[in-house]
């Protein structure tokens, strides 16, 4: 099992995502002889998981069932152990697009945190790219390194434990893109410039507060970055349903009551509950010269 390439059968050591129904999911490490307790009953790894195809519908001890899903960065984001606040797929999708990531890209990232963005970047740049990720917190860095090995993506990522604002990314002029998710990204703008290739590259920082964005933009402009832009992603979910209304009175002037016929049509209305503010994404370009 790898987060980069699909494999058909579940093996010992794999990470599997158990879909329990109604949006409930849990990630498990498959180990021979181990058991996982679910609300549908016990799941025995040796009998119920190992050797079965991903996507299987497995019956648990109480007669209920779960689907065993192949892990993806999107599913991992929803089920990972939170060591920090994380970014979700809505923001991550825009980041990977605006940074123009593709197979073969070299990316520098800080901080690693819980690894949500890291897994998505690795999947995008594999099989010939590489991620240099920096985390100042020793235990978080060690846990991220361990997870990358468990998920069999370690060959595409180098984890460094240092303060990116003081020590940079540990590489120079190799990156096609830089992503920052740290409290003071403006302090790392100079190191981001040095990490990007001489011929140029893309920059992105995530900040929850507009004051952080202002200071970052000032630092970017002072360092020579161009094409600065800041975006906020606010998805709106619509409820589509069939509505039946009487035909409109077009003023024909006919006497008598209006007809009882109704005209059904499909209507889309925004849901009352909407996703709120997560943060601002600031993008910039290092141009050669």
From Swiss-Prot:
Substrate binds at residues 20-22, 35-42, 64-65, 85-89, 110-117, 180-183, 205-212, 278. GO terms for biological process: mRNA processing; tRNA methylation. Gene3D superfamilies: 3.10.330.20, Vaccinia Virus protein VP39. The modification Phosphoserine is found at residue 263. It catalyses: adenosine(58) in tRNA + S-adenosyl-L-methionine = N(1)-methyladenosine(58) in tRNA + S-adenosyl-L-homocysteine + H(+); an adenosine in mRNA + S-adenosyl-L-methionine = an N(1)-methyladenosine in mRNA + S-adenosyl-L-homocysteine + H(+). The keyword ATP-binding does not apply. Residues 250-259 have a biased composition (Low complexity). InterPro entries: SAM-dependent_MTases_sf, TRM61_C, tRNA_MeTrfase_Gcd14. GO terms for molecular function: mRNA (adenine-N1-)-methyltransferase activity; tRNA (adenine(58)-N1)-methyltransferase activity. Catalytic subunit of tRNA (adenine-N(1)-)-methyltransferase, which catalyzes the formation of N(1)-methyladenine at position 58 (m1A58) in initiator methionyl-tRNA. Catalytic subunit of mRNA N(1)-methyltransferase complex, which mediates methylation of adenosine residues at the N(1) position of a small subset of mRNAs: N(1) methylation takes place in tRNA T-loop-like structures of mRNAs and is only present at low stoichiometries. Heterotetramer; composed of two copies of TRMT6 and two copies of TRMT61A. This is tRNA (adenine(58)-N(1))-methyltransferase catalytic subunit TRMT61A. It comes from Homo sapiens.
